[in-house]
């Protein structure tokens, strides 16, 4: 009986030690998790402050009079709030520049997404002899500097008669967006299970039906990512617009910024008002499609 009693005591002590060890490990892991989350939160907060500070500076100073920045300081709230800067920007043809940019970016994005989808599908879903070569060529095209092509594109648009028109901007915008878009969309389409296509083929779908009914709808997140990423780049593009457009009535929004800067070289609040109105559409699009943007970027990075 003594031996049995001692054995029971040893087993109880062993169980208590195991429970204590598990509890200590749980506490340590919980502390480590809290520390990791705290560090991540601090870095995220720093990133948020660094990101929002320029926008806050731009926004509040766009509501000042011409020399109030020197008198009140750049990070103090305006006193009083001066709305005439926005009235002057709007009355000096801002929306004309704005809608021309919308047309150019909209048409360019539609063409770019259509071509990218048709190019990425065979590269991602079909095995043919030239597949690796074509894919490598497209990837290599991403390294071509945009400014190297300014003079050839200028001569080309002049020769074919579209220089100084919005049509001259659409071709370069689409061409320089395609390599990166095909690269990302190919990686995204490779993550789609092949069983989906196989089951559709069993039901009688051919290649075209597979693409339009299965692959394309499942690629909406990737297409949304490309639309936002390239849309921001096209919206802010200055080099081609400045080279290929000379008539003031045909200029897009980035050129309008230069024009307002030239007309109001000392009136900084008016320039900041133009910048504020220019970035609002892109911020709005990102807020609306941020879930699809993150999903598309993560899916494209999983497998390629």
Q: What do the PLM-derived regions correspond to, one by one?
A:
Residues 1-31:
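Short, Lys/Arg-rich, polar N-terminal cytosolic tail immediately upstream
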Residues 28-32, 36-304:
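A structural signal for multi-pass alpha-helical bundles of membrane permease subunits
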């Amino acid at each position: 009986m003594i031996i049995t009693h001692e054995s029971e005591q040893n087993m109880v002590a062993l169980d208590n030690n195991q429970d204590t060890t598990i509890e200590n490990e749980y506490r340590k892991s919980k502390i480590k998790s809290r520390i990791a989350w705290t560090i991540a939160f601090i870095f995220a907060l720093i990133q948020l402050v660094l990101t929002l500070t320029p926008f806050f500076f731009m926004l509040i100073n766009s509501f000042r009079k011409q020399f109030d920045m020197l008198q009140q300081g750049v990070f103090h709230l305006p006193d009083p709030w001066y709305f005439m800067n926005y009235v002057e920007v709007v009355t000096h043809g801002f929306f004309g520049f704005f809608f021309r940019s919308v047309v150019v970016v909209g048409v360019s994005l539609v063409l770019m997404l259509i071509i990218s989808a048709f190019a990425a599908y065979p590269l991602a879903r079909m095995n043919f002899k030239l597949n690796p070569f074509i894919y490598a060529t497209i990837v290599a095209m991403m390294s071509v500097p945009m400014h190297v092509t300014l003079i050839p594109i200028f001569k080309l648009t002049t020769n074919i008669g579209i220089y100084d028109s919005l049509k001259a901007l659409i071709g370069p915008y689409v061409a320089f967006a395609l390599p990166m878009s095909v690269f990302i969309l190919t990686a995204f389409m490779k993550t789609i299970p092949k069983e989906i296509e196989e089951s559709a083929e069993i039901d009688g779908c051919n290649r075209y039906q597979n693409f339009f009914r299965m692959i394309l709808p499942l690629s909406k997140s990737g297409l949304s990512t490309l639309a936002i990423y390239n849309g921001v780049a096209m919206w802010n593009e200055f080099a081609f617009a400045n080279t290929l457009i000379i008539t003031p009535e045909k200029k897009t929004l980035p050129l309008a910024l230069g024009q307002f800067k030239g007309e109001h070289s000392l009136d900084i609040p008016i320039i900041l008002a133009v910048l504020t109105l220019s970035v609002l559409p892109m911020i709005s699009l990102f807020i609306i499609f941020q879930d699809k943007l993150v999903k598309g970027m993560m899916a494209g990075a999983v497998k390629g």
